Every structure is written in structure tokens, then in C-alpha cells.
Amino acid sequence: MAALADSLLDTDALRVLREGRPLVDLRSPGEFARGAFPAATNLPLLDDAERAAVGTCYKAHGQAAAIALGEQLVSGATRERRIDAWSAFAARHPDALLYCWRGGLRSEIVQRWLAETGHRLPRVAGGYKSLRQACLGVLDRFGERDVVVLGGRTGSGKTRLLAEIDDAIDLEALANHRGSAFGGQLTPQPTPIAFENALAIAALRIDASRTIVLEDESRTIGQLGIPEPVHRELQAAPLFVLEVPRPARAAHIYDEYVVAPLACGVDRFTLEQRLSRSLARIARRLGGTRTAHIEAALAHAFAGSERDVHLHWIERLLEWYYDPMYDHQLEQKLERIVARGDAEHIRRALERHVAERSQTA
């Protein structure tokens, strides 16, 4: 089986992550759930109960007994089902790579079984641990990258503009959260480890000579903390401020937070309750009278579904809460501002700035 020794070297971990080749994560579902990589699919050799049993056996009786128990647990029909799943994945993704926790026994066994079916997939040397360490290294060195920041008041369309810019990283998309009290998505956020891995890979895929564009964020996005090296760059990098009138921002928020969820099948009552709970989170800072006003307007809007009524409560929320908060924060960043203006002005300013930085690099 010498040909199976074509597993990647530890030094190739960065290339594996950069290329985004399909990955077969052979760890147990519990291990996978704590954090993996965007290109990974969990097809475990051992499920959680089997892994626990093998681990207990290893501690009590040693490696040989643990291996024997593993072979007993994954035998017969169970083994055939798992080989079928790996083989089907390999057939769909012949360029896939295998990994387990350290690139050891689990991936070696699956590699051997797959070879017997005609699928010769390499395994990642060092396994998950090697890939994870590579991601942490990318984040630790983030301060070496050239970074600029796109800011602007809530609803100004920063994320939309970010999507049109080369070499941008959408932190909110990676965190599956729009970064405010109202920013939760219908699906849960990734684990902190998965978020860090995805962010590191996104940075790795932008050439080191290029400028990375990030959206201005606080220290956390929903429940996820931004890695400290990235947060330091957000606090220090040149800032481009997108300026959009409040009515246009309210219309944008209405489309994203009301129209889009309803179009995705969220019922009106559920959406109203979600927005009401989000409002309750900021009630103390908003104040009782203003909270009551917005709560009443929100209920009235959902009772009649009129766009103008929705725009009323959204504009009040911007006027009374989000705009003053952002303006206060911006006061602390005035010396970093390179340009302010509408989307087209900011796009051109960013292009000029990045071109100038590239020439002086």
C-alpha cells in the first residue's frame, strides 16, 4: 500500500485551504459540530457513541484493544454503508482529500478501504489539527495585510457595495448575522471555530499583495467575536464612509428585514414577534416612551401590511437609536476617514486608494 503514502505534507495545509478542494471530515459528528471548514463534509468513520466506546477502551486496555473494538463496531452492514457513502462522495469529487483529527489511523483506514473500491484519495498530513493551525496562523498574521474599512450608517447598503468590490471579505456573511440587535438570520450562526476558519480561508484566498476591504464592525457580530488581530485592523485601517439619506436607508431595511423574510416563507406573526424581541433588546437604551411608540407602530404595520407604516417605525428606529449611536462612534474615527459620499463616489475612492497602495507596496 505504499502508493497510499501520497498524503499531503504539513507544509501543504495552506494550499489545501486556499484551493478549496472538497474535504471529507472523518471525525465524529460531535467533533465536526465544534468546528470544521467551509469545503468539508462530515462522513465519519465512527459516530459519537462508537468514538466514546473506543476512547474508553483505549484508556483501559491500550491501542490494540481499541483498534479491535473499532473494527468490531464498524463491520458488516455498517461498514458497507459507510464505504458506500465515501465512495459516492469520491465519485462526485475525485479531487477530494481525507482528514481525521491528526491525519492518523482513522484517515489511514478509510484511505485503505476506499482504495479497495478503486478510489485513491490522498489524506491531509496532520489532519484537522494541521489545517486548524494553518488557519490560526493566517489570523495571527492578519496585521501584516493591507486593509481598508467600509463604514456607514445602518441601512446604507454597505454589504451590497462590498459584494461589488474585489478582494472584500463579508464578515457578516461568514458570521451569518447582520451585526445589529435586529441582525439575526433564520438559520443559526456558525461556531466560533468554524467562523475563524472561514475568515482565515477568505483572507488566504486574497493575494498577499492585494488590499483587503472589510465592513466596519464592532467587536462582536451576533454571538461571535471577531478575532483580535482582525479587530485591531478594523480599529486602525483607513475608513471610507458610505452616506445615504435616511428615507433610502429605511427602504433598504424594509426590503431586507420585512419583505425578504416574508418572501422566504416566514409567516407574519413569527416575523413580527422576532422584530419585537429585537426591539426589546435595545429598549433600555432607547427609552420607554420611544420604545412604546415604535412597538405600537410595528404592530400597526403588521396589522395592515402597508409599506409606509413600516417605513415610519424603521425611520424612527434610525433617528432615535442607530444614527446617534453611529455618529458618536464615528466621532472617534474622524482622523481615519479617507472619503465620504454615495456608493459611486466611495467605489471610485476605494479604487484610487487601492491602486495607489499597490504602486507604493
Positions of PLM-derived features:
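Conserved nucleotide-sensing/catalytic segment adjacent to the nucleotide-binding pocket
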Residues: 166-234
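Flexible, polar/low-complexity N-terminal or interdomain linker segments that lie immediately upstream
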Residues: 1-38, 135-143, 147-151
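Glycine-rich phosphate-binding P-loop
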Residues: 105-106, 146-166
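Catalytic cysteine-centered active loop of the rhodanese-like fold, especially the PTP/DSP P-loop
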Residues: 70-125
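Short, acidic/small-residue loops that bind anionic groups at enzyme active sites
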Residues: 116-135, 237-243
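Positively charged, proline/Ser/Thr-rich regional signature most characteristic
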Residues: 17-90
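A conserved segment at the C-terminal end of the G1
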Residues: 111-116, 159-170
